Amino acid sequence: MPIPAKISFMNNEPFASPGRDRPSPLPSCLPGPLPGRLLGIDAGGGATRVVLVAGGEVVRRQVAPPMNALLTEDVSERLLGLVTGWDATAAGIGLPGLRSPAARARLAAELTRRADRPVHVTGDGETALLGAFGARPGIAVFAGTGSGATGWDGRRWARAGGHGFLLGDEGSAYWIGRAAVNAALRWEDGMGGSAALRDAVVQASGSDLAALVAEVHAHPAERQLLSRLAPVITDLAGQDETARYIAERAAVHLAALAQAVRAELGPLPVCGLGGVLAAPVIWHRFTELTGAARPLAPPEIGAALLAWRGGREEAGGCRGLEATHEDGGD
């Protein structure tokens, strides 16, 4: 599968984001100033992050509403608006929920035609991996609103998880928030949980449990109703046994994603990214289980790398990324 052969990570400095419109240098993951202005779009269940890269710097960034190919109406129109709204010569997009290589190719062709510039589309796992490792083999475990893992050993791709909130997303913010509400309900029913966790859930949700349950059932696809409660667990884990247990289980689930990909590809290095893994209580346990490191650059930078590499490929772009495997997580 073609990966940018000339990208090299010269050091281990983390990617810094000093401000929305303040230029910031990239980590040493690009081969000097690149031609053109490259747009990177990382869509996700919590937000869509966009960067414009020119001359080895991020010259502009934006946070847009969440986007998922399975859950978002008019996703092609929304992406077209982002692509045409920026002064970019090429764009790369990591989009969750785009199930088939053929669907990715169709969307890329449509956006390329309508935006009148090259647009390359892949899953969000692949752009996460590009940002985390560049040209190097590795495994990226992502845990935001959803969860999943993508790996590349230099020849083969593998993935685990990413099946969406109805059938998977273990260890994600949605999974943690659902576990928090479940524990609060169990306490009210006299079946476990804790009063401290129940009180924290009620305070964070801004309503009593009955109203929260009714809202979740009325709007089951609104994943933020539960995923926004994940900090209840990470904040309480140091003092509350139930919260600590949920955080531990989340870390174990995320580590299992990495181990599943390692079982297929071998003992590759692991990077962890996403808001859930930013919580120290989960990150520390996850690293104990996997030896993971932080990524050198975020997924939106990986999407910009996709835009660059796609422009260097003959006859149709970065096919190794645009047609690798099915994707369903974010």
Residue ranges and their predicted role:
Residues 40, 122, 142:
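Generic enzyme active-site microenvironment
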Residues 111-118, 157-164, 286-291:
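Glycine/charged-rich beta-loop-alpha catalytic/anionic-binding loops adjacent to active sites
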Residues 105, 145-159, 230, 279-289:
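Acidic-glycine-rich active-site phosphate/pyrophosphate-binding loop
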Residues 2-87, 132-139, 181-330:
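ATP-binding/phosphotransfer module of carbohydrate and carboxylate kinases, centering on a glycine-rich
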Residues 92-99, 143-146, 267-278:
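Glycine-rich beta-strand-to-loop/alpha-helix junction loops that act as flexible
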Residues 136-187:
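Glycine-rich phosphate-binding loop of actin/hexokinase-like ATP-binding domains
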Residues 122-123, 297:
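Short loop/edge segments at beta-strand edges and connector loops
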Residues 63-68, 83-121, 132-133, 219:
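Short beta-strand-loop/turn "lid" adjacent to the catalytic site in phosphate-handling enzymes
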